[in-house]
Every structure is written in C-alpha cells, then in structure tokens.
C-alpha cells in the first residue's frame, strides 16, 4: 500500500492538470502554429506564459497508480490495477473475461 500522502499528491497534480489543460494546450498550439506564425518576441512571450504555469500542471508529472493499493509501478491500463493485484483478482475469478494462460 502506498503512503496516503503520495496518493493525495497525485490527486492534487491531476486536479491541477485538468485546471490548466486548456491554457497549456492553446499556448502550445499557438507556438507551434504553421498557419499564422508568430514573431520571435511573441513566441518568447507565449513560452514565458507556459513557464509561469505551475509545474505540477504538466501532464508528464502525472503517474498512473493502482486504484486499490496506490502502487505506481507495473500498472495495467485496461484494468487500472497493479500486476500482483491483477493476478490475485484473476485467480479469485473477480475479473470477468480474464483467464490464466495455459498451453
């Protein structure tokens, strides 16, 4: 089980990312625009605007966690579970459609 403080920190990052998502996306779109290219000074202003946003609002700062244990490693996207919890649940027949492989 992960520490509660780490799980709360991750939730806080997720909220910040959602809050600043549109601002971040629109400013990046303006910087990269080929249709109406910006001058160098305008690009630097947009870059400064991006840098002024909180660090934890960047999507790369997020980490996918197991929703039962909070474990940050070995997560399966399809189930939202870490590997060892997924294995235990499959063996206990708690996940429909998932079976042990045998050949």
UniProtKB/Swiss-Prot annotation:
SUPFAM superfamilies: Glucocorticoid receptor-like (DNA-binding domain). It is found in: Plastid, Chloroplast. Keywords: Chloroplast, Plastid, Ribonucleoprotein, Ribosomal protein, RNA-binding, rRNA-binding. One of its GO terms (molecular function) is rRNA binding. It holds the Pfam family Ribosomal_S14. The keyword rRNA-binding applies. Residues 26-56 are annotated as: Disordered. One of its GO terms (biological process) is translation. Its main location: plastid. GO terms for cellular component: chloroplast; small ribosomal subunit. The keyword DNA damage does not apply. Part of the 30S ribosomal subunit. Belongs to the universal ribosomal protein uS14 family. Binds 16S rRNA, required for the assembly of 30S particles. This is Small ribosomal subunit protein uS14c. It comes from Sorghum bicolor. The lineage of its organism: Eukaryota, Viridiplantae, Streptophyta, Embryophyta, Tracheophyta.
